Amino acid sequence: MDQCPIPTLLEHGNFSQVLFNNVEKFYAPRGDIMCYYTLTEKFIPRRKDWIGIFKVGWKTTQEYYTFMWAPLPKDQNKDSATQQEIQFKAYYLPKDVERYQFCYVDEDGLVRGTSVPFQFCPDPDEDIMVVINKEKVEEMEQLSEELYQQNQELKDKYADLHEQLQRKQVALEATQRVNKTLEHKVEEKASWEKEKASWEEEKASWEEEKASWEEEKASWEEEKASWEEEKASWEEEKASWEEEKASWEEEKASWEEEKASWEEEKASWEEEKASWEEEKASWEEEKASWEKEKASWEEEKASWEKEKAPWEVEKAPWKEVKAYWWNDLHR
């Protein structure tokens, strides 16, 4: 049987809204019983209402022995009381002689009606003698054995069905967990797809930037080649300067020797100085023409001066001596 949804504690309702009729004091054991009851005009039945058989003295609606779902009336719009009935199968009924009673419980767990107590045993007030021949007894015993075997088969089948239900419940829970995992993976995959699309766009941007870098690199390589050529030119020019410097060093040595001779000649120059004064006038005329040439020499000299700066430092003492002699020469 299905298990009814009942609360753990009894919730008392109005016990007079459902009235039980024709309740016997005794019901024959191992037999089906009919339960007759009346739904009063103010009571509204619902789909999950049920009727249970309770042992007298029960405290909560969980203490039912067995139950049946209460069928809804065919005409629920009637304003008058409605007669209903329900059958309880013998297999589900109590096997002891305790006192029991019917209880009508609505889907909220409230008891809406209770019956008078009854028992499952023969009526002691009835004195009935039943004579059954031997063949009938054997037939009834065989029928009882068959019913017992059917009962055992039903119990075994019920146990198997219950076990199958448990296994299916476990499988269902596992499937639900797998579904949740799959849903999580689908959501995670969608997130990854979005992130991948973002990466693809960023990669395309990097590829364009890389192409730009490659073009710029090619330009740098061309410029580097130009610098290498220019450097080679500078190296050649430097070699030329080194040769020229060596020449100037030789010339310096020559000037040193010449200086010595100039010192010797200086004495004679002093004697000739007087005559040079006379020639100075003519040299002044030539000086004007030299000044014109000097302008062009000065431009050429400016470029030489940049290259000759280190050498000029070394030649400075000689220039002073030469200037002194030159002034003495033109006095």
Curated annotation (Swiss-Prot):
Listed Gene3D superfamilies: 2.60.40.2840
Renumbered ranges of motif LIR-like: 190-193
GO CC terms: autophagosome; autophagosome membrane; cytoplasm; cytoplasmic vesicle; cytoskeleton; perinuclear region of cytoplasm; PML body
Matches recorded under Pfam families: SKICH (PF17751)
Primary location recorded for the protein, binned into one broad class: cytoplasm
Location in the cell: Cytoplasm, Perinuclear region; Cytoplasm, Cytoskeleton; Cytoplasmic vesicle, Autophagosome membrane
Keyword Cytoplasm found: yes
Annotated region (Interaction with LGALS8), positions in chain: 292-302
UniProt keyword Membrane, yes or no: yes
InterPro entries in the record: SKICH (IPR041611), UBA_autophagy_assoc_protein (IPR051002)
GO biological process: positive regulation of autophagosome maturation; xenophagy
Biological function: Xenophagy-specific receptor required for autophagy-mediated intracellular bacteria degradation. Acts as an effector protein of galectin-sensed membrane damage that restricts the proliferation of infecting pathogens upon entry into the cytosol by targeting LGALS8-associated bacteria for autophagy. Initially orchestrates bacteria targeting to autophagosomes and subsequently ensures pathogen degradation by regulating pathogen-containing autophagosome maturation.
Protein family according to the UniProt entry: Belongs to the CALCOCO family.
SUBUNIT field: Dimer. Part of a complex consisting of CALCOCO2, TAX1BP1 and MYO6. Interacts with MYO6. Interacts with GEMIN4. Interacts with ATG8 family members MAP1LC3A, MAP1LC3B, GABARAP, GABARAPL1 and GABARAPL2. Interacts with ATG8 family member MAP1LC3C. Interacts with LGALS8. Interacts with TOM1; the interaction is indirect and is mediated by MYO6, which acts as a bridge between TOM1 and CALCOCO2. Interacts with AZI2.
PANTHER family documented for this protein: CALCIUM-BINDING AND COILED-COIL DOMAIN-CONTAINING PROTEIN 2, SKICH DOMAIN-CONTAINING PROTEIN
Protein name: Calcium-binding and coiled-coil domain-containing protein 2
Source species: Mus musculus (Mouse)
Gene that this sequence comes from: Calcoco2
